Amino acid sequence: MKARLYTKYTDEVVPALKAKHNFANVHQIPKFVKIVVNMGINASLEKGAMEDAAKDLTQLTGRKPVISRSKKDVANFKLRKNQAIGCRVTLRGDAMYEFYDRLVATALPRIRDFRGLSPRKFDGRGNYTFGVPDQTIFPEIELEKIKRQQGMDITIVTTAGKNELAHDLLKLMGFPFAEK
């Protein structure tokens, strides 16, 4: 069974984008490629910080995160080469659509004073990156087991080559952009 948002994409979003932008070929219509969820961890925190972040990321995504390591020494940040500095998960396929559905429908509205995300955070190539203040906005995380609040960066990678196409795709998929 396909994800709910994938069927919405094929049944509603594709015809709307094709009509609006006059695409000649179905393969020109933008679509999601992947969603990357990244948690940066302060290397000088107590011992269990990386394990806690990896456990939280596993609960959110259902995938085991990859540990990101530093490439070189940076004395100002008290950072050594090959020291763990974060963890990330790349979601594709049905898992990507399920995570996007939970993000848009339940997690983002739980942010305090949420009025939508800025439509200016596109990178010029049709990808959208935004930060989430802490992991407790997701209902999968149990508040009693949280030792520290940990934010994360979420990147939505699309096949759209332009920001305008990616904005239209995300808007039609229910993404909560702030009004200008």
Identify what each model region corresponds to.
Residues 1-180:
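Ribosome-associated RNA-binding proteins
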